[in-house]
C-alpha cells in the first residue's frame, strides 16, 4: 500500500527528527507515547522447566519424584542401576526453573533465570543446576538453562533440632543462566498498521494520542480504535518501520486525567485518593468502643497442718470504654482532602477512615469509585 512514507528514507527521517525536536521543546511537560503505551505484538513470553540441582552439602532431598528424575538422568548417560536400588540423593534437589523471554530475543542470547525447590530440600546454596529445557505455552523448547546458583538465604540446623533460617534458602538465581535456542515469531513487520495499546485504558487519552500522531505525521494517519488501542498507518519496509516507530513513540501529548478513584488496602491500612474525588453534602459521626479483659490468677494456700489443697482461681476484670465520636458536616463539592484532614485532627486511625469511606460510599456521598484490595 502506498502512503506518505514511501518516499526517500533519508529525507523522511530528517523531517521526522526535526518535527520531533520541535514538539519535544514545546511540550516538555507532556508524556511520551512510549511511556503510556506499548506496541501490540511486541511482548515478552514466560518459560518454565523442571530440572535437578546437584552438589548440595547434604541439604537436598530423597523424595520419590526426585529419585525418579535422578534415575532417568542416569539412564540418559547409559547408567543403569540394579533393580530395587534406591540412591541416597541428599545432595540433589528437584527444582522448577522459570524465566521471561524478552521480545525480539535472538538465538544465542542469554537471560536470567529463577530456580525454586519443589520438594523438601532445606537449601539450594552451593548447588549447580543441571541442563534444563525451558518450554513455552506451546510445548516447544525456547531456551536451555544450566549453571551455578546464587542463593541469598541460609539455613542452619543444630544437633538438638533447633533451626535458623534467613531469607529464603530454597530459591536462587543464575545471571545469564539460560541460552536462547529458538526465536519467537513477531508480527511487528507484518501489515499496514502499528497498534499502540494504552497501559491504562481511557477514551480521552486514546483520542488525544491519535490527534497528536496526526499532527505529527499528517491527517488520517492515526485513529483511536477504542479506549485502549490507537492504530497508526506504517510503512511496510522493515527498516523504514523501525525508524518510523522510533520517531512516533517519542511524540509528546497530554494524557487525560484518570477517573476519580479511592484505593483502600484493608490489610495494611493504606489509602490512596485520586485528585478528582469529590464529596456530596453529608454529616458523619464515628465512635469507637474498646473492650479490655485482664486475667488475674489468685492462689488459695491452705494452712501448713490442714488437709486442704492449693487452688488457683481466675479473676477476670472486664473494662469497656466508649469514645464519644464527633460529627463532621461537609458541604457539596469538597474534596476528600477535607475529610482526611478532619479525621486526622481528632486522631482517628486508618481503620476508622476506611469505615467512614465505606459508609459515605453506601450513602452515595462520594463521587468516584471505592476500590478495596
Curated annotation (Swiss-Prot):
Q: Which InterPro entries does the annotation name?
A: Flag_FlgI
Q: Which domain of life is it from?
A: Bacteria
Q: Record's Pfam families?
A: FlgI
UniProt key word Signal = yes
User: Cellular location of this protein?
Assistant: Periplasm; Bacterial flagellum basal body
> What are the UniProt keywords, alphabetically?
Bacterial flagellum, Periplasm, Signal
- Keyword Signal, does the record have it? yes
MF terms from GO for this chain are:
structural molecule activity
Q: Where is the signal peptide?
A: 1-30
- Provide the Gene Ontology terms for cellular component: bacterial-type flagellum basal body, distal rod, P ring; outer membrane-bounded periplasmic space
**One biological-process term from Gene Ontology?**
bacterial-type flagellum-dependent cell motility
Instruction: Give the protein's function.
Output: Assembles around the rod to form the L-ring and probably protects the motor/basal body from shearing forces during rotation.
> Which PANTHER family does the UniProt record give?
FLAGELLAR P-RING PERIPLASMIC PROTEIN FLGI (PTHR30381), FLAGELLAR P-RING PROTEIN (PTHR30381:SF0)
Its subunit composition reads: The basal body constitutes a major portion of the flagellar organelle and consists of four rings (L,P,S, and M) mounted on a central rod.
Family recorded in the similarity comment: Belongs to the FlgI family.
The protein's matches in HAMAP family, at most eight in alphabetical order, are given as: FlgI
What protein name is recorded for this chain?
A: Flagellar P-ring protein
Gene for this chain: flgI
